[in-house]
Amino acid sequence: TTMPREWSDRIADRLAMFGFNLVRLHHHDGETVIGGDARRLHKEKLDRMDYLIAALAKRGIYTTTDIYVSRKFPAGVIPEHPEPLKNYEDYKVLFLLYDSVCDEFLHYMREILSHTNPYTGFQWKDDPAIVSISLLNENSCTTQWNRNPKLAKVFLERFQQFCRERNLQAEGGSANPAFRDFLDGLYRKRLEQIRAELRKIGCNKPVTDQNFQRGTFLALQREACDYVDIHLYHDHPVRVGEKMRRFLQRSAIPLGVEVPGACFPERLIDKPFAISEIEYCTANDFRAEHAALLGTYAALQNWDMVIQ
């Protein structure tokens, strides 16, 4: 996303030649700031990204993007987490737990969306070529909260406080039915803070979130978004040991059209539906079926966005 201009033009030409009309700009948040500090935008790399957006727009190609994907921090940036933030999965958990991290997120979102692209003349929030915004990439709280044992302990302590305030039993920890209510409350509080900031800066772009994993709990959270977005992979490599990975080498068809079929129940009848990451992973012998299955079902169910 921050490539030299000549590469932006070449890639935009190539995408237009193939007939693509939408590109997702991804993993750029770490490149567009200096040292992970959201208060210090990297002007040169942001300029390159602006040029890419403009180059795509000139060829009739729209853009969608994320606010947080993989930005990392040196020591001392997050008061409650003084050590360096090297694992971006931890950010998604810290975002729920601490106001300071949410404030950092809102600051970067405000800066990047209010920034004027010199090649289009639009602020990102007003640019018609930028069609939608994803907030935090793959941030399902049901799968993220306990990945870091230190942060999981904080979650459980907060849950006990949550139960005391409501005169609920806290036994069972995360197995307690009230634990999901606790997680949902944390998430909805943050989502409303984001919504309020977007209203404040005058951003009316469609917004989505919770694009990782599937299930009723996440469907309820996606109802609070403007559209549903899902990520889906067939035969994603499975780690074996420290360095080796293996593939199943299975077709999706005898697996009940696992991909894209697994996303069918995730649609919400009153919301546009998108898949911003989908792939039959390289080295799978059945990758040729991907285009036929994906195109057929996307047309049958009238999906609104598909990005490989």
Q: What is each model feature region?
A:
Residues 1-225:
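Active-site mouth of glycoside hydrolases
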Residues 56, 61, 190-206, 217-235, ...:
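Catalytic-core region of carbohydrate-active enzymes that cleave or remodel glycosidic bonds
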Residues 145-148, 237, 288:
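Single-residue recognition of alpha-helix boundary sites
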Residues 237-243:
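Short, charged, surface-exposed secondary-structure boundary motifs
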